[in-house]
């Protein structure tokens, strides 16, 4: 059986291959949703309702799957600035005391929280109280009825675990030819789909317990257009190419074919109709906003160096855990060369659908 870690965070530290220096693709998406996030809070957050039954003057915010780097701090600051704006505009008495903010930064236990808090802007330390919350967001990580605004971006495609059958040699769902779910093998896709549905149910169920009545959950990320396999997107092409590089390394004895067959990424990009169905299935929330948004970088080709650096920052930890030390450098050196020889044809590749969703706890 595979030796996947229980958690698979982005590459830590602040070196050249770290996520902190290779997350601009995600930053552009966050910046693109910034105005919509503010509009959603101004329209849907009821400050009086949130604290009607509370003696506290603290508004709690959580960023789930925060990783490291500036993106999470920018998200949180935008939320706080908007709440302050709303509070001032409404001249809200808000329990008669100055409004304070507590921010919970959540990610897997082996996320690099040291780097996260070491790089926290000084100004933010004066604006809110910070707490690191290690744990999978597929389960409850905060006390019941304690959260006012939850946020998650570009993280829900990570599953809680690799579907068991895709690494079972006796199963028809064995993902023998690929290291991802690229939707080309139906048995593999179905195994991933089942795991995704369970994880989405667990995620929304946990947030329903944590959020107070009237609290908001803001989600953004990517889905596949209905009927389009991931293999036809540029992201799918990239990961399949990384898998090809691993097979080349196996032929030269650097790793083994068996190890590759037992390696499959715990990532599932659902089709937009699948994702919408799972959101609607949970009856604890009302859907205030559900819309498609554009990613500014979808309309221009990315450089090979950019692609290599981004995917190394994302996949470094899980590849190293499964294949051992020394494989990652060789793998991404080979990948960079293969990418230069066979560059991505962005005009032919299908594009992901970017979504922005606002849920309100009933």
UniProtKB/Swiss-Prot annotation:
It is an enzyme of class 2 (transferase). Keywords: Magnesium, Metal-binding, Methyltransferase, S-adenosyl-L-methionine, Transferase. S-adenosyl-L-homocysteine binds at residues 19, 66, 71, 107, 136-137. GO terms for biological process: methylation. This is Probable S-adenosylmethionine-dependent methyltransferase At5g37990. Its EC number is 2.1.1.-. Gene3D superfamilies: Methyltransferase, alpha-helical capping domain (1.10.1200.270), Vaccinia Virus protein VP39 (3.40.50.150). GO terms for molecular function: metal ion binding; methyltransferase activity. Binds 1 Mg(2+) ion per subunit.
